[in-house]
Amino acid sequence: METVYFNGKFITKEEVKISPDDRGFLFADGVYEVVRWYQGFFYDLNGHMTRLKRSLRELRINWTDTDSFPDFAEKLIKINSLENQTAMVYLQVTRGAARRSHNFPKPDVLPTVYAYAWGFLPEVKLKETGIKAMLKEDIRWSRCDIKSVALLPNTLSFQEAHENGLKECIFVRNGLITEGSHSNIFFVINGTLYTHPESNYVLSGITRKNILRIAEDCGIKIREEAVEENRLRFVQEAFISNTSAEVMPVTELGGNTIGDGVPGPVTRIISDKFDNEINSLKG
Ligand code: PDD
C-alpha cells in the first residue's frame, strides 16, 4: 500500500482529501519540487530547498514548515521500502483552499502540502544512444524561473513530442533556445559548453547548476549564453539535464542530426564525472 504525506500526516493515497476549492485545483496556484534518492541519500537537497523557498517566496505562499521537507521526504522513502532503490519524491505546495476569487484569501489559509515517493529504473540505454527532440516556439509565460505547477504549455508541448516519437520538446523564444519542457539544454560548440543563462525564461535546474560546476572542474570552457536556433548547424554536441535523466545526450534536434548523431566526447566526460560524483557520495 502506498503511503503519502499530506498536510503533516502519513496516510494512504486513498485517504487524501483535497478541497475542490483548493487554489492548486482552481488556479494552478502552487509550486513543486522533484528530488532524487540514490539508494541512501537525496542528491543536492540543499539546492532543491533553496529553489523551493524561492518559488514559494515569489508566489507569496507562506508555508512555515518548509524545513520539514528533508525529514518527511526521507520518511516517505523508508515507509514505502524504497531505501535501497533509485527513487524520487514529488512535493507540491499550493496556496490552500478558499472560495474562488482572483485575490489571495484574506486572512491567509493554510497551504496544502502533498508529497509521494516512487521507485524507478534509470534510462541507461537511452544514455548510450541519445534521444531525439523537437523544437517549438516557447509558448510559456515569462516567469519560467518559478517552479510552478502551471505546466500546461509544457505538457501540451511534451505531448506533441511524444506523439511524434520524440523524447523532449525544446523551446525557442525570439530565435534563442531556452530549455526543454522538463529539462535544461546544453550545447557544445568548438569545445565550449553553452547553456541559457539563469533568467526568467528558464528554470534554474539543480542538475544544470551541478553540471556547470563539474564542467568547470574539468577545465571545460563555459558560456552561460543562449544559443540561437540558426546556429544549430554549428553545434557538435547537445544534451539535456534534469533530476531524473541527469545528463541525457541529444543526437537529433528539430529534425537535424547533432554532430555525428551519437553522444559526443564532452557530453561523455560530463556524464561520467556526474556518475563518479554520485558513486563517491554513495561511499
Ligand atoms: N522538471 N526546466 C524545466 C522546465 C523543468 O521542468 C525541469 C525539471 C528542469 C530541470 O530541473 P532539475 O535539474 O532541477 O530537475 C528544467 C522536473 C524533473 C519535472 O517537472 O518532473
Q: Which role fits each region the language model picked out?
A:
Residues 176-198, 204:
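Glycine- and Gly-Pro-enriched alpha-helical subdomains that act as flexible
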Residues 205-210:
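Feature captures the catalytic cores and cofactor-binding loops of soluble hydro-lyases/lyases
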Residues 1-169, 173-176, 199, 212-283:
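Conserved alpha/beta cores of soluble small-molecule-handling proteins
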